[in-house]
Amino acid sequence: MEYRQLPHGNETEKFGVLGLGFGGIGTTPVDEIEAIVRKAIDHGINFFDMCTAGATYAPVGRAIAGRREQVFLQVHFGAVYDENGEYGWCRDFDTIQKTFLWELEQLGTDYVDFGFLHCVDEDEDFDKLIEIGVLDYLKELKAQGIVRHIGFSSHTPSVANRIIDTGLIDMMMFSINPAYDFEKGDEYGIGSVKERFDLFRRCETEGVGISVMKPFFAGQLLSAEHSPFGQALTHNQCLQYAIDRPGVLVAVPGVQTMEHLDQVLKFLEATDEEKDYSVIGTFTADTITGTCVYCNHCQPCPAGIDIGLVNKYYDLALAGDDIAANHYTKLGVKADACLQCGHCEERCPFSVKQMSRMVAIDEYFAKR
């Protein structure tokens, strides 16, 4: 396992490049959750993202008992849980505070390594977190040593840059995979794709670490049928791709079962040839014509829709990502605001029929 140093951390804060995410593990038997965490630690994994169902915290706490100093926990302020332990998105200070204290208790610890502003995708959302006092709360917790580092998760480069501008951030969680980073070529080398790489370079330069979510695009890149490229990549290729991006310290693929963990652990023994992802250089715009790759070349939308983000949440929801579906419901402007003006379709380099997509997206979420 390769370990990378947190730029703004002390010399002991080194993460294995392979971590774990628990977004879909909430329905897994608690004994299996404990076994997964223990086996992961035994194999050198020491970074765990705790955006997950409430039922996950206690078994994780039991698994790390006696080994707390060996692991790093990334906890999200704004991810909360209902009476059944199901994940929810929240912007109420009292609920966020209560949830965090409960998480500490369940985990059996008196501190977390990273306290994250959770899923901040719009400027108005960041404004809200400041307004209700969550950012100040994180600063207080850091001063007390209860939160070691402040970070955030986002899907939006412009918002991410604004949060980094505060000077408070040591870690950012961002989705990175070949599908999200695809662009047609020099003619279209502007907008969202360039913004993403500029953001990653900024993080590298300023010492903000990146933890990577969605390295497999919710599993879609692993299937020729579902991949936007029409060709399957492997777990090893996707993980190496994410780890090679500027500023990245750790990739956190989601696991739900011991079999999932075993598959991910194969990365540690994979050869350079097995990790080689140069095949993506052969993918062309024709390969993905008709598929939204969230490049946002269609922007600005006259109705104010973030078309790339709306499509991303929709595709992830279709792939079974309930957290992404929940995030969609919190957007300030959703698919139902579409004016059917065709502006986006005129600008789309991939010939995506976004007007009909907006109708389908609205209908899909209305039925959930």
Where are the language model's segments positioned?
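Structured C-terminal cap/extension of enzyme domains
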Residues: 42, 46, 198-368
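Glycine/proline-rich, positively charged
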Residues: 31, 42, 87-211
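Conserved, mostly hydrophobic/aromatic
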Residues: 6, 20, 48, 60, ...
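N-terminal binding-site loop/beta-alpha segment at the start of enzyme catalytic domains
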Residues: 1-75, 110, 143
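N-terminal small/glycine-rich loop or linker at the start of catalytic domains
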Residues: 7-25, 74-87, 116-119, 216-221
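Active-site mouth loops of central-metabolism enzymes
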Residues: 21-31, 81-95, 123, 223-232
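A cross-family glycoside hydrolase active-site/sugar-binding cleft signature
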Residues: 21-23, 49-51, 74-76, 115-118, ...
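Short hydrophobic/aromatic-enriched beta-strand-loop microsegments
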Residues: 70-75, 168-177, 271-278
